[in-house]
C-alpha cells in the first residue's frame, strides 16, 4: 500500500516500518543480577551460623553453665564467683578495643593475673578471629536485607517465589557444610578441634597445658564440643524454619494459581 509522507523522508509508495519490541536487559544487568543472587545464597547461611556463634559467645549464662557442668572451679582452683566475673570480662573483651585481656584474681591472699602471657597472647588471636565472625555476621545481614529490599521489594526484579527458591538454595548449602562439620565433630571431636586450631591460628599459643594454664582449665574440650553442637543445632532449626516458610509459600501460591 502507498502512503504520503508529509516530511518527504520516505517517498511515495513506501510505508515506514515501525518495530515494536519489549526492552531486553543488557548483559551487564543480567550478570549483576546473577551476582547479587549468588551473594544472597552465600550470605544467608553465613548470617545464620555467625549469628549463632555471636549469640553463644556473648551469653554469660552459657559460660556459667559450662563452668558448673565441667567443674572449671575444681580444675582451676578458683571460686565460681571469680570465674563468672572472668566470663563477663571475656565477653566485653571481644566487643571493646582493648589489646590485652587483663583479669585480676586473688590467689593466696595476693592479687594476680588470671592468665599467663601465653594465654593472653592466644586470647588476642581469638579476639581477632571473633572480630572476623562479628563482621561476617554484620555484612551478611546487610547483604540479605539489601537484596530483599532492592531486588524484591523496590525493583520487583525477582518475585517472592524467586526469593523463596534462593533461600532454599542458601540454607541447603549451609546445612551441607554444617552437616559435614558435624560428622567430623561426632566421629572425632578431638582431631577436628585440633585441625580447626591449626587452620585458624598461625602460631602455637593455643597449645595449652591443662595442668597449669587456667584458660583450658576454665574451658576444657568438652565445653567446646557442647558449644559446637549447640551452634549446629540452632542453625539446623533455623534452616528448617526457612525451608518450611519457603516451601509453604511456593506450595500455597501454586495451589492458588491452580484454583484460578
Residue ranges and their predicted role:
Residues 26-62:
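Hydrophobic secretory-pathway targeting helix
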Residues 30-31, 141-187, 241-260:
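Juxtamembrane interface at the cytosolic side of transmembrane helices
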Residues 55-93:
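Juxtamembrane non-transmembrane segments of integral membrane proteins
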Residues 186-211:
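Juxtamembrane non-transmembrane "cap" segments at the membrane-aqueous interface
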Amino acid at each position: 500500500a502507498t502512503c504520503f509522507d508529509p516530511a518527504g523522508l520516505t517517498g511515495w509508495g513506501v510505508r515506514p516500518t515501525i518495530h515494536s519490541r519489549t526492552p531486553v536487559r543488557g548483559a551487564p544487568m543480567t550478570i549483576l543480577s546473577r551476582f547479587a543472587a549468588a551473594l544472597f545464597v552465600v550470605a544467608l547461611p553465613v548470617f545464620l551460623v555467625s549469628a549463632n556463634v555471636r549469640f553463644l559467645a556473648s551469653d554469660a549464662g552459657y559460660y556459667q553453665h559450662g563452668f558448673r557442668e565441667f567443674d572449671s572451679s575444681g580444675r582451676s582452683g578458683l571460686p565460681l564467683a571469680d570465674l563468672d566475673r572472668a566470663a563477663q570480662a571475656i565477653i566485653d573483651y571481644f566487643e571493646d578495643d582493648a589489646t590485652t585481656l587483663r583479669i585480676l584474681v586473688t590467689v593466696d591472699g595476693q592479687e594476680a593475673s588470671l592468665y599467663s602471657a601465653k594465654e593472653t597472647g592466644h586470647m588476642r588471636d581469638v579476639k581477632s578471629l571473633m572480630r572476623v565472625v562479628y563482621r561476617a555476621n554484620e555484612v551478611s545481614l546487610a547483604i540479605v536485607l539489601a537484596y530483599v529490599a532492592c531486588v524484591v521489594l523496590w525493583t520487583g526484579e525477582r518475585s517472592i517465589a524467586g526469593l523463596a527458591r534462593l533461600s532454599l538454595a542458601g540454607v541447603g548449602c549451609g546445612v551441607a557444610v554444617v552437616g559435614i562439620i558435624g560428622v567430623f565433630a561426632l566421629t572425632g571431636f578431638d582431631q577436628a578441634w585440633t585441625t580447626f586450631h591449626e587452620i585458624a591460628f598461625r602460631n602455637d599459643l593455643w597449645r595449652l597445658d591443662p595442668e597449669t594454664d587456667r584458660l583450658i582449665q576454665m574451658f576444657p574440650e568438652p565445653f567446646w564440643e557442647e558449644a559446637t553442637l549447640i551452634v549446629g543445632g540452632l542453625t539446623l532449626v533455623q534452616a528448617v524454619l526457612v525451608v518450611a516458610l519457603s516451601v509453604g509459600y511456593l506450595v500455597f501460591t501454586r495451589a492458588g494459581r491452580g484454583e484460578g
